[in-house]
Amino acid sequence: MSKPETTAAPNFLRQIVQADLDAGKHAKIVTRFPPEPNGYLHIGHAKSICLNFGLAQEFAGDCHLRFDDTNPAKEDQEYIDAIEADIKWLGFQWSGEVCYASNYFDQLHAWAVELIKAGKAFVCDLGPEEMREYRGTLTEPGRNSPYRDRSVEENLDLFARMKAGEFPDGARSLRAKIDMGSPNMNLRDPILYRIRHAHHHQTGDKWCIYPSYDFTHGQSDAIEGITHSICTLEFEDHRPLYEWFLANLPVPAQPRQYEFSRLNLNYTVTSKRKLKQLVDEGHVSGWDDPRMSTLSGYRRRGYTPESIRNFCEMIGVNRASGVVDIGMLEFSIRDHLDATAPRAMCVLKPLKVVITNYPEGQVENLELPRHPKEDMGVRVLPFGRELFIDAGDFEEVPPAGYKRLIPGGEVRLRGSYVIRADEAIKDADGNIVELRCSYDPDTLGKNPEGRKVKGVIHWVPAEGSVECEVRLYDRLFRSANPEKAEEGGSFLDNINADSLQVLAGCRAEPSLGQANPEDRFQFEREGYFVADLKDSRPGKPVFNRTVTLRDSWGQG
């Protein structure tokens, strides 16, 4: 794709916050990031994290991390730990202690009782299917539940018995009494509490009734003094309900909800259900597989926090739905690593080269810059009689325009001498296993006299180079819209069978032998790579390809 503009795109919420502060509405702003701990954060969450934490930073406010933990059956401490780690990795720190919606269960219960006493909530015995029938449709109004007119006393008694664990899961629910004829489906007597006999990771077995997201969210914002409650556009229709609860309860503050468009990235799936399916069915190695759209996956792939933050700044914040080209994200990491990643050489498909006219036993220590522009110092490569080049850099019958090594032809070894291919040694099956070459001793750092050498290839010394594993990652899906499957198919049909190639026996220059996990490099002529967070260790490195040097997919 063409190079995107790197300047920040418009952010309408920044203007709203500035206007509120200028008008003296708030002494300081307080935002929050409220994930449900039922999965790992993905690239879409990064936009929300950067927005909420970024606004708080920019305007000297606070940003809370609050886990919306109202569904214990799907939540786990593993996800809580991973979410906290991802936020810190992105470069943000929440204000104060971590918050949990479950911290407010006692207060939420007390407010539910107040709604019952005010005649604004009732206990309903309809099951899920019946409730769906009574609810109506977008074009037809709903019908009142036959239990809507229960007395306050009966509702208080039933709700207390629900809390005491007297009824099985799903037998009853507590619903708000709003308007079954409302064109907004969310106002048709929404559920406030469900019976769910499930152990909770924070509150244990104290509760067997749990509040709904809608009943929890706005009141939690009010308790925490959130000034700007920012969520994605799918919650726009929930805002009237958010405001109804705040208007009908004695909450300590009146937060305001704002919506922005979620991040939709092509070639990508961000549905937690689908990501979990990829993991559970073994299509990927785990939530942090480098092909996943999770932040832990991008981290293991070699993406930097700076590149993701810059990407989120580039795409901006607005209310228009659209699809962002994944090429913008790939541009962002290329741009950052081009400026920061030290250069190194790694031969992915080694072919041995013997330089026949180089003195046996002689070794020259050649100094090559770690970076062409930045002052990162030098690394030392021992140059001797035997070395490795990539098998793809020699062709006996070259295609048109081939500028690498051919029989009788010359190339320059990066940072070293010009060599000529004199003889190809083959095994019994006709495979080339070794090249015999000669070098021009007068070409170190300069062109040979009277002839032009166009090609430059990378190499590593045979002695001192490090054997390593290289994992060539690519996009997990071959379709720009993975969700779009043929009739009877699924998004799994769009998985890219070539999204991972594992190469064993690669040879890396000596300086890479002591690479620590998450050390990043540009492998010259190959791409940007990172030492794997889990599997790589000094002396036995494993490198993951973060991204190719150039966009090999083009406009998707």
From Swiss-Prot:
It comes from the Bacteria. ATP binds at residues 36-38, 42-48, 232, 262-263. Its main location: cytoplasm. L-glutamine binds at residues 68, 213. Belongs to the class-I aminoacyl-tRNA synthetase family. PANTHER family: GLUTAMATE--TRNA LIGASE, GLUTAMINE-TRNA LIGASE. This is Glutamine--tRNA ligase. The gene is glnS.
